[in-house]
């Protein structure tokens, strides 16, 4: 929805917390959204041509936002320098969607996301992540 997009866009403007914290918040919101509907509905949306443009537009919005926060995290020295925001965002979002389509629990998907982001983090980033547990 447009309200959701506006709220998510405000994450970019927030100065509280690190970019990595905002990355987690965004990823967790994406995950929460996937669990608002049945996985079979998501599968239908993904494969029906009538919904393809909307699905692609939605995916591109999330990819762009997540890539922005990943790059900002890298600039803050919280992610490894070899991480390329756009392609890493693509992989994370694709994998999260696949996990949801394969009926992984929300907790499993959150844990996966946390593990992947922690694995891409610098020592300073890992310390921030672990401090938030």
Residue ranges of model-derived segments:
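Hydrophobic alpha-helical segments that form the core
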Residues: 29-31, 80-119
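Short, basic, alpha-helical segments at the C-terminal edge of helix-turn-helix-like DNA-binding modules
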Residues: 1-5
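Short linear capping/connector segments at secondary-structure termini
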Residues: 42-50, 130-133
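Charged, low-complexity C-terminal accessory regions
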Residues: 29, 125-133
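Short amphipathic alpha-helical interaction patches enriched in hydrophobic/aromatic residues
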Residues: 8, 12, 49, 77, ...
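Hydrophobic alpha-helical connector segments
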Residues: 6-36, 88-89
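Amphipathic alpha-helical packing segments from all-alpha helical-bundle domains
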Residues: 33, 51-76, 86-94, 101
């Amino acid at each position: 929805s447009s309200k959701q997009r506006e709220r998510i866009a405000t994450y970019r403007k927030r100065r509280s917390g690190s970019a990595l914290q905002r990355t987690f918040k965004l990823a967790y919101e994406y995950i929460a959204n996937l669990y608002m509907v049945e996985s079979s509905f998501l599968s239908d949306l993904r494969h029906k041509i009538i919904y393809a443009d909307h699905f692609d537009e939605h995916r591109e919005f999330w990819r762009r936002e997540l890539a922005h926060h990943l790059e900002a995290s890298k600039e803050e020295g919280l992610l490894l320098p070899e991480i390329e925001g756009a392609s890493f965002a693509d992989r994370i979002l694709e994998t999260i969607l696949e996990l949801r389509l394969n009926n992984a629990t929300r907790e499993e998907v959150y844990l996966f996301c946390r593990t992947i982001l922690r694995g891409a983090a610098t020592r300073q980033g890992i310390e921030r992540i672990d401090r938030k547990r």
